[in-house]
């Protein structure tokens, strides 16, 4: 009976270990979460964005012309909602890659944002952390990719 109890404890601990290793920071979840971030910006989903952003969030925009914290991002979304600003027609990500190290992950790729008259392509690099089993976006860096010169 004692051996059976020991086996149960060992199996239980092993399952907890596997479960902890398969937290929110995995390739599939992070790609889906990042796609949800893009969708939330397009749809001005204030609640989702507020819950996703870490308290220490920072967003460095193109050429560091603007650097936002969580409060600034949320205030901008509120302004867009209040003014019914729906100028962004689409946000499409491509070539998304994920790197995971411990409780930190980098998601990078390109987002094509169409606000008219022509879409603009941005390279992005976002840093996600796992905090008490929840994935949070703690940093975002975006840079416009210049259009190729026409021959």
Residue spans for each PLM region:
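A beta-strand edge to alpha-helix "cap/lid" segment located at domain peripheries
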Residues: 21-51, 58-151
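Bacterial Sec-dependent N-terminal signal peptides
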Residues: 1-25
């Amino acid at each position: 009976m004692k051996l059976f109890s020991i086996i149960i404890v060992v199996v239980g601990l092993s399952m907890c270990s596997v479960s902890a290793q398969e937290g929110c920071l995995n390739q599939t979840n992070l790609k889906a979460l990042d796609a949800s971030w893009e969708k939330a910006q397009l749809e001005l989903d204030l609640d989702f964005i507020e819950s996703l952003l870490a308290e220490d969030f920072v967003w460095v925009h193109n050429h560091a012309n603007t650097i936002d914290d969580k409060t600034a991002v949320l205030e901008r979304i509120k302004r867009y909602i209040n003014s019914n600003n729906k100028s962004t027609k689409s946000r499409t990500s491509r070539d998304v890659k994920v790197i995971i190290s411990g409780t930190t992950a980098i998601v990078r790729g390109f987002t094509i944002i169409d606000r008219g008259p022509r879409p603009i392509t941005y390279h992005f690099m976002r840093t996600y952390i796992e905090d008490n089993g929840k994935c949070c976006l703690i940093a975002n860096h975006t840079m416009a990719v210049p259009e190729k010169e026409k021959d």
